[in-house]
Amino acid sequence: MRIVLALSALAVAVVPTSAFAVDYLSAEQAARLMFPDADAFETRSVRLDAAQLQQLDAQGVRARSATWAVRVARRGGATLGFVVTDAVVGKVELIDYAVGIALDGSVRQVEILSYRESHGFEIRLPAWRRQFVGKGGTSAIGIGDDIANISGATLSCTHVTDGVRRIVAVVALARQAGAL
């Protein structure tokens, strides 16, 4: 009997805790969705130096990494925009997302790539993600400022919003430095 209980406990222990995980898009699919006119995507590695990281900090943006992979969308050699993927913690699980940035530095589109939380999946709804379109540069990107919260998804909304703000700031710094 004890062996059966021990085996049952072991079986439960190895079952993934995230039974609600859903993958919606790959990073490549998201890039093509955001820039359908692109005929090529070039991945550039952008490394922020200490001064740039301090600039982000001064803007109230917490840089989780100094190195970022940025997809440059091109058509006939001309740059159309940029796509950056990232992951943030929702409540307890990771949310993978991608942000398309237009040449003027504004958000073109936000896509949720994977969502693993049991609640708060409403952040994937187009109406919520559309709030980011056109934001960037001098416009505030924050819950309560110009991005509405979703009841029951407060942490997911807040963390994805913080992530979008971070990506907008990182791309702006990289462009100022001539890295993009």
Which residues fall in each region the model found?
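N-terminal signal peptide c-region/cleavage motif recognized by signal peptidases
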Residues: 14-16
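Flexible, solvent-exposed loop/hinge segments and secondary-structure transition points
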Residues: 19-150, 154-158, 162-180
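Bacterial N-terminal signal peptides that target proteins for export
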Residues: 1-7
